[in-house]
Swiss-Prot record:
Binds two Mg(2+) per subunit. The magnesium ions form salt bridges with both the protein and the DNA. Can also accept other divalent metal cations, such as Mn(2+) or Ca(2+). PROSITE patterns: TOPOISOMERASE_II, TOPRIM. This is DNA gyrase subunit B. The lineage of its organism: Bacteria, Bacillati, Mycoplasmatota, Mycoplasmoidales, Mycoplasmoidaceae. CDD domains: HATPase_GyrB-like, TopoII_Trans_DNA_gyrase, TOPRIM_TopoIIA_GyrB. Mg(2+) 1 binds at residues 441, 514. Its EC number is 5.6.2.2. It comes from Mycoplasma pneumoniae (strain ATCC 29342 / M129 / Subtype 1). Residues 435-549 form the Toprim domain. Residues 400-422 are annotated as: Disordered. It catalyses: ATP-dependent breakage, passage and rejoining of double-stranded DNA. One of its GO terms (biological process) is DNA-templated DNA replication. One of its GO terms (cellular component) is cytoplasm.
Length: 650
């Protein structure tokens, strides 16, 4: 950020206190989202965000995360260092205040930070409250200070000056989550690395280091992107064939007046985008490094600018007449990869989760900046401008044909309970909150599943063969595909751009395929379809993967089912002298209806894997790589991950 962010002295008076910390351990989910895996990672993000805030303010250049055995988590930066003097309100050291009082932090004082990105603004004190051990070292003017806490924020002694140190300034935090409050689950290296890399892209010039010492051979990662969003777009489009090589980029910092308040804000806008030859849109937006997955006013301003400029150039260059139907926002987004990142001192979000930006003053600002850079690009690059217009016109024509096909289908069979696909064996209940749809590979297994199910709440939809690979297909092909049409009709929500979540007919949509390569391919094809065309179902956790057994072990008139080779080997080691018969299931069709119910469909005993997406941009890149046209990066990915192919996270 600019030098004018380096404002007044950073001392105890900069730390503003809003409320106490008592409720955190009683209701941790209110503060970090959950006590499970997501909440565990959220604790890391809260401490990382404090360091990134320092960097965004221009006070730090390096942030480092280290993971050690036994969940020891260390975050350090070379920022100013937390003030060490006595806080005027608490009469305790400011370091102790920051880590024991909820909402105490420099981010609430506009003179200390111009922008801030803490996920819920609750700060490091919540992490302290949820930690069994919490230590902090502060360097100020080559003096090192130390303070320790335990048992969820109980301070151990006073802040201690440990004397001179090599480091001029900075902060180091070490914590261990308290598993009497948090659920014990591993940190995911892939999730952490992806988020840290994303932060490096969004904050150009900042170095972020990650050291994972939990294994016998420690792994180290380091990211620094002087190109910022331009390098981010290149990274996202690496598996896609670009329409042209140029990445369009612009940035601007401007002071604008708030529409709803009598005050002005200095807002920084960065935008980068590039068209590719796919049919999917990949628009990712951020405010203060927070991924606004539902968009908001910054995305609206971006899209409005593109629509305006493309339509004007289309008319001026005789692609369209003034009286022709104009190119729409859906048309201009086909094959577009874009990043919109803003830094705002007072962001307003719709809802508590910060998924949609609501500041109305942002829309015209982004519109103005994007219009300026995009118009200049179109004027200076007529060949690329024509390629963009032709692509959007092809998208417009495909949209028209798709609309005609949809209308024809609706006239033939308006979607109601009487027009469900013929192969669907629906459930009896009409209560979506308890009903389940099993998508089953093949008519044979579908027949077994129909017999074995609980027909009151379980519906079965058999699919014949592999569905269309939507990553390589145009919307019109997708809509006319028989298997996909049956799936869309059964689910009931439609597909984008006409997706309506409130029409969902089943709370759980369960993919049940064979445990072989073909089954895995069908699962991937279905997941690609859900991600690209029914993303809200993935986002809110409606998609599941069934886990049918791989083995049946029979001994002493007992049958035992196992889902993995690991389970089988562990059982063998525990029963070395037991005589048994072993059956390996090659497919669902080898089980009878009772076995399928008892192992895979009975809610009391079955195992379901919920499909979740930690970060849409990471998943977008994974699907493009695995299901797109580019062979070399897919081969490289498979070679690198061949040994872990059963555990690929997207």
């Amino acid at each position: 950020m600019e030098d004018n962010n380096k404002t007044q002295a950073y001392d105890s008076s900069s730390i503003k206190i809003l409320e106490g910390l008592e409720a955190v351990r009683k209701r941790p989910g209110m503060y970090i989202g959950s006590t499970g895996e997501e909440g565990l990672h959220h604790m890391i993000w809260e401490i990382i965000d404090n360091s990134i805030d320092e960097a965004m303010g221009g006070f730090a250049s390096t942030v480092k995360l280290t993971l050690k055995d036994n969940f020891v988590t260390i975050v350090e930066d070379d920022g100013r260092g937390i003030p060490v003097d006595i806080h005027p309100k608490t009469n305790r050291s400011t370091v102790e205040t920051v880590f024991t009082v909820l909402h105490a932090g420099g981010k609430f004082d506009n003179d200390s930070y111009k922008v801030s990105g803490g996920l819920h603004g609750v700060g490091a004190s919540v992490v302290n409250a949820l930690s069994s051990s919490f230590k902090v070292w502060v360097a100020r003017e080559h003096q090192q200070y130390f303070l320790a806490f335990h048992n969820g924020g109980e301070v151990i002694g006073d802040l201690v000056n440990e004397g001179k140190c090599d480091k001029e300034h900075g902060t180091k935090v070490e914590f261990v989550p308290d598993f009497t409050v948090m659920e014990k689950s591993d940190y995911k290296q892939t999730v952490i690395a992806s988020r840290l890399q994303q932060l490096a892209f969004l904050n150009k010039g900042i170095q972020i280091d990650f050291v994972d010492e939990r294994r016998q051979n420690p792994q180290s990662f380091s990211w620094k992107y002087d190109g910022g969003l331009v390098q981010y777009i290149h990274h996202l489009n690496n598996e896609k064939e670009p329409l042209f090589e140029d990445i369009i980029f612009g940035e601007k910092t401007d002071t604008v007046k708030s529409v709803s308040r009598d005050e002005s804000y200095t807002i920084k806008v960065e935008v980068a985008f590039q068209y590719n030859k796919t049919y999917n849109q990949s628009i990712f937006s951020f405010c203060n490094n927070i991924n606004t997955t539902e968009g908001g006013t910054h995305v609206e301003g971006f899209r409005n600018a593109l629509v305006k400029i493309i339509n004007r150039f289309a008319v001026e260059n005789k692609f369209l007449k003034e009286t022709d139907e104009k190119i729409t926002r859906d048309d201009i987004c086909e094959g577009l990869t874009a990043i919109i990142s803003i830094k705002h001192p007072n962001p307003q979000y719709e809802g508590q989760t910060k998924k949609k930006l609501g500041n109305t003053e942002v829309r015209p600002l982004v519109n103005s900046i994007v219009s300026e850079i995009f118009e200049r690009f179109m004027l200076e690059n007529p060949q690329e401008a024509n390629a963009i217009i032709r692509k959007t016109l092809l998208a417009q024509e495909a949209r028209r044909r798709s609309q005609e096909a949809r209308e024809l289908t609706r006239r033939k069979s308006p979607f109601d309970s009487g027009s469900l696909p013929g192969k669907l064996a629906d459930c009896t209940t009409r209560d979506p909150s308890i009903s389940e749809l099993y998508i089953v590979e093949g008519d044979s297994a579908g027949g077994t599943a129909k017999t074995g199910r609980d027909r009151y709440f379980q519906a079965i939809l058999p699919l014949r063969g592999k569905i269309l690979n939507v990553e390589k297909s145009h919307f019109e092909q997708i809509f006319n595909n028989v298997e996909i049409s049956a799936l869309v009709m059964a689910v009931g929500c439609g597909i984008k751009p006409d997706f309506e979540l409130e029409k969902l007919r089943y709370n759980k949509i369960i993919i049940m395929t064979d445990a072989d390569v073909d089954g895995a391919h069908i699962r991937t094809l279905l997941l690609t379809f859900f991600f690209r065309f029914m993303y809200p179902l993935v986002e809110q956790g409606n998609i599941y993967i069934a886990q049918p057994p791989l083995y049946k072990v029979s001994y002493s008139n007992k049958d035992l089912y196992m889902q993995t080779d690991v389970q089988l080997e562990e059982w063998k080691q525990q029963h070395p002298n037991l005589k048994y018969n072993l059956q390996r299931y090659k497919g669902l069709g080898e089980m009878d209806a009772i076995q399928l119910w008892e192992t895979t469909m009975d809610p009391k005993v079955r195992t379901l894997l919920k499909v979740t997406v930690e970060d849409a941009s990471i998943a977008d890149k994974a699907f493009s790589l695995l299901m797109g046209d580019e062979v070399p990066p897919r081969r490289e990915f498979i070679e690198q991950n061949a040994r872990n192919v059963k555990n690929i996270d997207i």
